[in-house]
Regions:
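Active-site neighborhoods of divalent-metal-dependent phosphate/nucleic-acid chemistry enzymes
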Residues: 73-107
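Residues at secondary-structure transition points
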Residues: 18, 35, 58, 62, ...
Length: 137
């Protein structure tokens, strides 16, 4: 099963426990495949460098570069051309959809209300991290 995980779920899984963390564990263990695009990785690095994450990074002795190095071990980076037309209000959400389409993902995992409201994109279900875990068994 190939997943594309949005930046907020990815960040949550990297920094805290819970369903997003469990999904990343499945990817680390090879139970699922995880794909990201360069645009999504860039967004992750931009978000994680924000001052509000400095404390948790310091407490866990991690840097944005170290997190990226950790991800490179179990994430496939795909070339994801932009969508031909906008789907969502937020261009960052369209980047998730473009990545899923390019990767031929089986599931899009997101906590974003706009993405989740779509329910499905080009035949790819859009689900929460908890729902993804249920589907994966």
């Amino acid at each position: 099963v190939l997943l594309v995980i949005d930046t907020n779920v990815l960040l949550s899984g990297l920094l805290w426990r819970g369903p997003p963390h469990a999904l990343l564990g499945k990817a680390r263990d090879g139970a699922v495949d995880l794909a990201l695009s360069a645009v999504l990785i860039e967004e992750l690095l931009e978000v994680i460098a924000r001052p509000k994450f400095a404390d948790i990074l310091a407490r866990t002795s991690r840097t944005p570069k170290r997190i990226l190095d950790e991800l490179r071990v179990f994430v496939d980076v795909v070339a994801a051309p932009p969508l031909p037309r906008p789907i969502c209000r937020d261009p960052d959400d369209d980047a998730v959809l473009a990545c899923a389409l390019a990767a031929r993902a089986d599931l899009i995992v997101s906590g974003d209300d706009d993405l989740r409201a779509l329910g499905m994109f080009e035949g790819i279900p859009i689900v929460s991290a908890a729902e993804a875990l249920i589907r994966l068994g």
